[in-house]
């Protein structure tokens, strides 16, 4: 009986396998019939090129020769007075050789070895013209005296710097070759879409030149705040592997066009985790053209010092939200001064473009032709004003970022002589000749000064000169206390101090709650 049950189970399993095999066979036939087509949900069949479906080899092969490794040359004996020690430390095998050769009475000439140039990898780049013009990142070649270029065939050249632009992190180099060089062309990054395939070629970790990786465009228009100096706010994000050393290398689309300059990665560990960023070609190309023509990029300015709004600052000024930028200083006889901009004004619109923060304003100004007149919309004492202003060529606006929140308990400790007062662990004093000399405060400056900070971390600094509180000028600490107590009675959270620190000014909120 048991044997009969086992027999029946085997028969059922065999029958099921036959059915499954038949279904799989039918499925394979469907795939064969579809050939190079697939159907997306709710879409028509899409064609996929044979080359891209099975391999990127045909796409990549002609591109690799146009991608270069960038390095600099360093000599050990240029590094320090302890050249011999440094040399043995960096090349531990020399220590072993020295011992062996010493036993054989053969001298090891470390001085000659130290004269041997050592290549220090910097990053990647790509050739954009047969005459040897090369695009890379500014941060790759910044502060480097000798720039060495190695081609895919290991041919090496010394490059000269044609021009650079730290604001967009781009640089243009040139090498001189007797033969025309392979090159690549920029494509239109505006045509690229999220989900498109992209290919990155570069020199990761400085010794893996010609490395090819692929991925898709994960997002566009990313503002990643690479640093406060950078004005690019529309990075392309990709999951193609980008590592240290890939900086300055090209990002290609499947049409073999450069649609981005690989620039940065997001990684807590400093290695690729699938989040890389590239400067779009439509941002890079006009900058490169200006570097080719002039060797630099000139931009306009307003002649004001600006800072981002915070909730604390907005609350004091009676402004809703944090969109806009706060003017903390106006350069005398500058464009802003001539237009009538004042300290404490909030810039909310530049022409027909809304101003979200300091970086956005800098980007807008960078896009504005020099000497063009625009309408600037500002808020002053809760009223909107429109001021015409002409953008002139010079350095960019000074940005202040010392607007961190300060929420310390308030301690009032007025001294008997009424020369100083302590609030939030910060001691303020009337400005005396002794303090003016100690903190190098010019004679034409008035205000109260910070003489002590009783906390480890503070946005304030010793010697900070407070010239205004809210909209009022101040030159006596008694006024600080009056304004402070009035703010508490009105149930305000902060008062706003205008600090002069060296050549710049910044608004910093002081908590009263």
UniProtKB/Swiss-Prot annotation:
Signal peptide: 1-23
Catalytic activity: Acts on substrates that are at least partially unfolded. The cleavage site P1 residue is normally between a pair of hydrophobic residues, such as Val-|-Val
GO annotation, biological process: proteolysis
Positions of substrate binding: 245-247, 302-306
Gene that produces this protein: htrA
InterPro entries: PDZ, PDZ_sf, Pept_S1C_Do, Peptidase_S1_PA, Peptidase_S1C
Name of the featured protein: Probable periplasmic serine endoprotease DegP-like
NCBIfam families: degP_htrA_DO (TIGR02037)
EC numbers, comma separated: 3.4.21.107
Domain PDZ: 290-381, 418-502
Cell compartment(s), UniProt: Periplasm
Active-site residues per Swiss-Prot or TrEMBL entry: 139, 169, 247
Single GO MF descriptor: serine-type endopeptidase activity
Keywords, ordered alphabetically: Hydrolase, Periplasm, Protease, Repeat, Serine protease, Signal, Stress response
Chief location bin: periplasm
Organism, as annotated: Rickettsia prowazekii (strain Madrid E)
Family matches, as Gene3D superfamilies: 2.30.42.10, 2.30.42.60, 2.40.10.120
Region (Serine protease): 124-289
Function: Might be efficient in the degradation of transiently denatured and unfolded proteins which accumulate in the periplasm following stress conditions.
CC per GO annotation: outer membrane-bounded periplasmic space
Family, similarity comment: Belongs to the peptidase S1C family.
């Amino acid at each position: 009986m048991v044997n009969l049950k086992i027999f029946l189970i085997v028969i059922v399993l065999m029958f099921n396998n036959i059915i499954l095999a038949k279904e799989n066979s039918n499925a394979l036939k469907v795939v064969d019939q579809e050939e190079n087509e697939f159907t997306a949900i709710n879409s028509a069949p899409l064609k996929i090129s044979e080359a891209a479906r099975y391999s990127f080899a045909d796409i990549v092969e002609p591109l690799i020769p146009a991608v270069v490794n960038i390095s600099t040359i360093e000599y050990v004996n240029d590094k320090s007075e302890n050249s011999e020690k440094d040399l043995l430390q960096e090349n531990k095998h020399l220590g072993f050789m020295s011992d062996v050769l010493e036993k054989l009475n053969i001298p090891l000439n470390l001085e000659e070895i130290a004269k041997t140039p050592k290549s220090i990898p910097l990053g990647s780049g790509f050739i954009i013209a047969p005459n040897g013009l090369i695009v890379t990142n500014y941060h790759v070649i910044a502060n480097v005296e000798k720039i060495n270029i190695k081609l895919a065939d290991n041919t090496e050249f010394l490059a000269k710097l044609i021009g650079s632009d730290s604001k967009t992190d781009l640089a243009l180099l040139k090498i001189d070759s007797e033969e025309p060089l392979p090159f690549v062309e920029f494509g239109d990054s505006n045509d690229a879409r999220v989900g498109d395939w992209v290919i990155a070629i570069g020199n990761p970790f400085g010794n893996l030149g010609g490395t090819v990786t692929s991925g898709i465009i994960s997002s566009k228009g990313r503002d990643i705040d690479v640093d406060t100096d950078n004005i690019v706010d529309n990075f392309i994000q990709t999951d193609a592997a980008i590592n240290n050393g890939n900086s300055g290398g090209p990002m290609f689309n499947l049409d073999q066009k450069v649609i981005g300059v690989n620039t940065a990665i997001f990684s807590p560990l400093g290695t690729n985790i699938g989040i890389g960023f590239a400067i779009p070609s439509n941002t890079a190309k006009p900058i490169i053209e200006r570097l080719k023509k002039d060797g630099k990029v000139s931009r306009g300015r307003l002649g004001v010092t600006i800072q981002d709004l915070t909730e604390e600052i907005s609350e004091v000024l009676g402004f809703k939200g944090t969109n806009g930028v706060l003017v903390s200083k106006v350069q005398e006889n500058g464009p802003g001064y001539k237009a009538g901009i004042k300290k404490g004004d909030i810039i909310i619109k530049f022409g027909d473009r809304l101003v979200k923060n300091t970086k956005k304003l800098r980007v807008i100004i960078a896009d504005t032709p020099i000497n063009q007149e625009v309408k600037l919309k500002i808020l002053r004492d809760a009223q909107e004003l429109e001021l015409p202003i002409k953008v002139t060529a010079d350095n960019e606006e000074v940005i202040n970022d010392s607007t961190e929140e300060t929420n310390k308990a308030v301690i009032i400790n007025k001294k008997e002589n009424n020369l100083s007062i302590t609030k939030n662990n910060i001691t303020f004093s009337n400005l005396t000749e002794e303090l003016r000399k100690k903190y190098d405060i010019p004679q034409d400056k008035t205000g109260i000064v910070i003489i002590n900070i009783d906390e480890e971390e503070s946005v304030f600094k010793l010697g900070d000169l407070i010239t205004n509180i809210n909209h009022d000028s101040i030159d006596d600490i008694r006024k600080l206390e009056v304004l402070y107590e009035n703010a508490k009675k009105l149930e305000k959270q902060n008062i706003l101090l205008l600090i002069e620190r060296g050549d710049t000014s910044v608004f910093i909120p002081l908590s009263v709650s």
